[in-house]
Amino acid sequence: MKMDSLIKELNLLWEPVRPFLVTQIEELYGRQDGHILEIGPFGGLIFALARKNVGKSFSIAAFPQAAIALYRQDARKHGLEDRVRIIETNSSLTGIVDESVDLTIFRGALFFPAIFQVDFKAIYRVLRKAGIAFVGGGFGKYTPAEVISQIRKRSEQLNDTLGRARVTIESVRDQLRSSHLEGCCEIITEGGLWVVMRK
């Protein structure tokens, strides 16, 4: 399968998880305003946030190339092509203005080094003061077991085909240390492996 087909299937498969992950993100963010940025190919959470009116403006930092057309299709499907701006970029967030984002979401960030490397410094750079980033992966703490069980096997197959790496808490800590950002980040393991970054 081509990468765009794999990404498309994985994002469709995860649609039932989105409302539950969004609940966790809403809880962390604690606001209804601000600019929200979703990063990378494994997304769609931004559409759920926009429909719930969590945030005032919305952008997607779309990469790799295979993900860009998929996001445009998704925006049309959800009737949000006028509200969600799709920016062609890379994992260093080239073209995203410094200190312009209040909430950043990057699902799948830690697990696909064959496709991209997570750039924690870039994520910190684009956050406004008091901004928050939710970076990592997993089903989230509110997704019911029955929803997880329906998609787990196929999700694992697709992730493995895309080159998912096994990541430890210590390896994530090492990345944060090397980025000199460990002081503003918390690693949480409830519902996956996530880094919560606060500026």
Where are these regions (language model features)?
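A short SAM/SAH-binding and catalytic strip from SAM-dependent methyltransferases
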Residues: 102-117
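Conserved alpha-helix/loop element of class I SAM-dependent methyltransferases that forms part
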Residues: 14-34
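Class I SAM-dependent methyltransferase SAM/SAH-binding core
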Residues: 35-93
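A short glycine-rich, Lys/Arg-flanked "PGG" loop and its adjoining helix->strand segment in the class I
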Residues: 117-132
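A short acidic, Gly/Pro-enriched loop at the edge of an enzyme's catalytic core
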Residues: 92-104
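Conserved class I S-adenosyl-L-methionine
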Residues: 134-159
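Class I SAM-dependent methyltransferase Rossmann-like catalytic core
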Residues: 1-19
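Short alpha-helix
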Residues: 162-180
